[in-house]
Amino acid sequence: MVPDKYRGGRCLTMRASGESGDNLSPIAPVEFESPVGQLLAQILRTHPHLLPAAVDQQLDNLQSDKNDQTEETPQSQDLLYKRIAEVKEKERQKTLEEIIYCLIVQKFVDNEISMIPKVTETSDPTGRVDFWPNQEQKLEFVHSPEAFEMIQSHLSLVLGDRMVGPLSTIVQISKIKLGKLYAASIMYGYFLRRVDQRFQLERTMKTLPEDFTKSQARFEDPNPGKQLWDPDSLIRIPPHDDDDGRGYGDAEGKQYRLRSYVMYLDSETLQRYATIRSKEAISLIEKQTQALFGRPDIQILDDGSLDTSNDEVVSLTFSGLTMLVLEAVAFGSFLWDAESYVESKYHFLKS
């Protein structure tokens, strides 16, 4: 099911304060490096309504370039030709990555959501770094009601008891842990969009299994002492203790819950849905995370253990931490949409 969500869009041009002329502040933390990426980023800033056509044109160019290279392949490849082919393939991959990233950024722009900038030290007396706006409602609306219900459970898992405390309470956390939490939440958003699309399609086609609401969670509740943003714990779907069985009904009055649907799926299907499909997507998750939190300063000691003593600790509120998680989940959902759209125009996913 290919998302058709890249048509039109409102203009959200962000000019750096105190500057004049055509200098525009970055609308995303990752810098575009390829000529195609820089062109698309400029179009997104100044003429966002032209971006869909520009993306399609660039994907056509990539396909033509790939076809031309295939036709030019000699019967006996020498080392020089192989090297040239490898360089061209890397250039295509970088271009493809930045096309996907630009489509992700466009989704944030269309929903009037400002992406969180690089997390850096501030002059605030408390050391707070989370002075970005509260956009929880906007980030909620990019998901279906059923999906956001599961996102709230994800927040409860990764934040734990912090969810019940004042949102203005300041906590200290290392950048490495923040990066792990952010990257894991991207992967959760990717999985959630993928499985939600299947759920919504089956519900529309009235092909949902009759007994799927009777299934139980296959996973044990997470160990309270475990770091809950470990990717291994992300696809746990524990039932709520106060679950009243209410779901989202159809025209016939039948009640369905995405949570119950996920628990109904077999482990092989769950694993497949939780797997990132392309190396380009994996690379973008890494780049987005490092653009926000920097490259982790980790050293391997002689005994094989990891030394993270140089890891920087930052302060932020529970509200800011919540915004980080919600943005990451939205990023993952948009990543699935963008990857699927690009695949519909330029086949690059492995079967």
Whereabouts are the PLM-identified features?
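Long compositionally biased, domain-poor regions of proteins
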Residues: 17-351
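N-terminal chloroplast transit peptides
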Residues: 1-26
